[in-house]
Amino acid sequence: MLILTRRIGETIHIGDDITVTVLGINGQQVKFGTSAPREVDVHRQEIYERIHPGSASHFSGKHPY
């Protein structure tokens, strides 16, 4: 897993057409903005697990530190 550090307003690029921007931080919550083509699904982990029940995910949803 790639781990990145970003500040509010900073963006990361995934490939040529996906961006993730840090919009805000409030305590332990981070607000992201994403931009991706319509054919790319973007979901929070708990929503993804509902859509794909029983799928083996390498994310546990718990902080590994």
Swiss-Prot record:
Annotated signal sequence range: none
Cellular component terms (Gene Ontology): cytosol
Record key words, sorted: Bacterial flagellum biogenesis, Cytoplasm, Repressor, RNA-binding, Translation regulation
Tagged with keyword Cell cycle: no
Subcellular location: Cytoplasm
Biological processes annotated in GO: bacterial-type flagellum organization; mRNA catabolic process; negative regulation of translational initiation; regulation of bacterial-type flagellum assembly; regulation of carbohydrate metabolic process
Major site of localization recorded for this protein: cytoplasm
Superkingdom field: Bacteria
GO MF annotations, alphabetized: mRNA 5'-UTR binding
Entry-linked PANTHER family: CARBON STORAGE REGULATOR
NCBIfam families: csrA (TIGR00202), PRK01712.1 (NF002469)
Subunit note: Homodimer; the beta-strands of each monomer intercalate to form a hydrophobic core, while the alpha-helices form wings that extend away from the core.
Family listed: Belongs to the CsrA/RsmA family.
Function per UniProt: A translational regulator that binds mRNA to regulate translation initiation and/or mRNA stability. Usually binds in the 5'-UTR at or near the Shine-Dalgarno sequence preventing ribosome-binding, thus repressing translation. Its main target seems to be the major flagellin gene, while its function is anatagonized by FliW.
Protein name: Translational regulator CsrA
Organism of this sequence: Bordetella petrii (strain ATCC BAA-461 / DSM 12804 / CCUG 43448)
Gene this protein is translated from: csrA
